[in-house]
Amino acid sequence: MIPALLLAASVAACPLPSEQRMIEAQLFFGRDVEDRTLVGDAQWSDFTATVIAKTFPDGFTVTDGDGEWRDPKSGKVVHEPSKILLVAAKPSAVLTSKLQTVMDAYKTRFHQQSVGVITREVCAAF
């Protein structure tokens, strides 16, 4: 579960008047499915449309990545293409729930052990 610390942003005053305190979340989605196949572009597009866009209708960014991690079960180093989702939103319990929903949906749909996540307090304006 994503820590409830998202509720209490403690960034110092934002430097630009138009900025406000937000949480920046990066989610890392491995595209290797059980060492047999990759989550294809069409499958990713469908996941983006049916899960991510509906969960974050105010906007998000997706980039391609190239990741490497050690499988805790086998000890094997896995190298795989990935997608990186970037979301910036006001800190809240709702944000925490939305991030967890997207992570859980991806793990279930594509048989993944995990989805990586980094959250940090930032100042942002759109």
Residue ranges and their predicted role:
Residues 3-7, 11:
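Hydrophobic helical h-region of N-terminal Sec-dependent signal peptides
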Residues 32, 68-69, 122-123:
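Short, internal active-site loops enriched in acidic
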Residues 53-82:
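Short, intrinsically disordered low-complexity segments
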Residues 77-126:
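Helix-rich interaction surfaces within compact, conserved domain-sized segments
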